[in-house]
């Protein structure tokens, strides 16, 4: 299946998870996500929104998920972050080199760079949900939309809950309007998505461009450089105000 959604991510408490902090840094706690689903696998592309609420043409990152691992396109995310920083401070291009490492990092590598436990960045539980009505429980969530029929999947091992709302007007169409309510306790977030799912035979494979473990120290240094330049920009903005 393929899909396109508008999404909104909200923390369930004041303690924001690491991945949400990164999304907020690129103004992407709400945006658009498109992707493909095959049994046990997900490929996602995340897009920021323009000021007029239209979707940007290029994704700010991509994520590949299967039962074994979660892979993040850190190369694309860095490129977007670097552009945002250099737009505000052109001299930052000297401190922040263009990306030259492998594009994707694993959840283990991401956790090492962020200094958090692996379960704070992995998303493998999402690959275990099957797009089938078998075994689903009909529910009536408080955020239900008129004209939608809602079903809840059995909770995942980590407590992740997924509720799908199908438009009753197009329940058996090839392209179906969907309303998704997703709660991930490990990441302390609630995610709401609205869009469409199109049935299609999909074959997904892990991305080929991977970062080696030897380059993680370099990535950690790059992250520190980004943080330092960002703080410099924020300090300058506060002084100006």
Task: Give the location of each predicted region.
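Subset-of-secretome marker
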Residues: 1-241
């Amino acid at each position: 299946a393929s899909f396109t959604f508008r999404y909104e991510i909200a923390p369930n408490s004041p303690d924001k998870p690491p991945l949400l902090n990164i999304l907020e840094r690129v103004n992407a706690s709400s945006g658009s996500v498109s992707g493909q689903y095959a049994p046990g696998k997900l490929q996602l592309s995340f897009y920021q929104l323009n000021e007029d609420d239209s979707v940007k043409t290029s994704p700010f990152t991509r994520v590949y998920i299967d039962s074994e691992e979660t892979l993040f396109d850190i190369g694309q995310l860095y490129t977007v972050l670097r552009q945002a920083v250099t737009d505000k401070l052109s001299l930052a291009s000297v401190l922040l080199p263009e990306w030259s490492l492998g594009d994707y990092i694993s959840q283990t590598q991401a956790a090492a760079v962020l200094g958090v436990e692996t379960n704070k960045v992995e998303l493998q539980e999402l690959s275990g949900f099957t797009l089938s009505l078998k075994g689903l429980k009909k529910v009536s969530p408080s955020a239900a939309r008129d004209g939608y029929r809602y079903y809840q999947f059995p909770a995942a091992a980590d407590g992740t809950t997924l509720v799908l709302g199908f438009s009753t007007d197009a329940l058996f169409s090839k392209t179906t309007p969907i309303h998704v309510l997703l709660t991930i306790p490990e990441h302390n977030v609630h995610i709401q998505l609205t869009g469409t799912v199109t049935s299609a035979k999909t074959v997904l494979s892990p991305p080929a461009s991977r970062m080696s473990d030897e380059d993680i120290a370099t990535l950690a240094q790059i992250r520190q450089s980004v943080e330092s330049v960002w703080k410099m920009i924020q300090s300058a903005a506060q002084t100006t105000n």
